[in-house]
């Protein structure tokens, strides 16, 4: 039963509904998934996953630092995310944060947020989830180290990545200037 607190629902029409979900509160599907996730974790589970997220971020930060990456804020302990700057690689070989992100895609790794925050040059905002296993984190470290080495030995290869995705690098300038917001099948294109 919906109870008396949902004034916008007619009980006679839908006795078990909480009413219409609309966009005023954001994406209703995302909100519902977040709510279900929090409820499934429960009172004890929420602090535990926060601890795992922090542990994963600090582990990755330490491992990447050991392998030659520059942390934007090395004196800080990571909360659930940390920032790596590849500005030294850009200065040495012209390799950018975008090149690292695109190269990760070839290894089946979702690219981290790049160029945020804007005050850190050539940065990657790395945010491992609380559910990543140590094996997955270690694989990420191995791939990042390989890319760091490749940025020095074969920078042109990294500038061309990704090679294995259905779509390679998009023309960002063209996309910003020509706002095609609808798909037109090739047979109907002018």
Q: Where are the model-predicted features located?
A:
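Non-catalytic terminal extensions of PLP-dependent enzymes
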Residues: 9-10, 14-20, 25, 38-190
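Active-site PLP attachment segment
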Residues: 1-3
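His/Asp/Glu-enriched, well-ordered alpha-helical/loop segment
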Residues: 34
């Amino acid at each position: 039963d919906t109870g008396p607190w949902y004034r916008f629902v007619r009980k006679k029409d839908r006795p078990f509904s909480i009413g219409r979900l609309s966009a005023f509160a954001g994406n209703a599907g995302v909100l519902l998934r977040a709510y279900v996730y929090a409820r499934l974790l429960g009172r004890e589970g929420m602090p535990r996953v926060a601890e795992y997220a922090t542990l994963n971020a600090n582990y990755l930060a330490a491992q990447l630092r050991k392998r030659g990456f520059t942390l934007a804020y090395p004196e800080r302990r990571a909360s659930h995310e940390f920032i790596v700057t590849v500005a030294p690689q850009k200065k040495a070989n012209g390799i950018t944060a975008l090149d690292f992100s695109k190269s990760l895609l070839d290894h089946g790794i979702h690219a981290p947020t790049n160029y945020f925050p804007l005050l850190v040059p050539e940065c990657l905002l790395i945010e491992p989830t609380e559910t990543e296993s140590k094996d997955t984190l270690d694989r990420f470290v191995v791939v990042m180290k390989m890319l760091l080495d490749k940025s020095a030995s074969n920078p042109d290869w990294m500038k061309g990545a990704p090679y294995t995705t259905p779509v390679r690098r998009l023309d960002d300038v063209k996309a910003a200037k020509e706002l095609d917001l609808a798909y037109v099948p090739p047979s109907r294109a002018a």
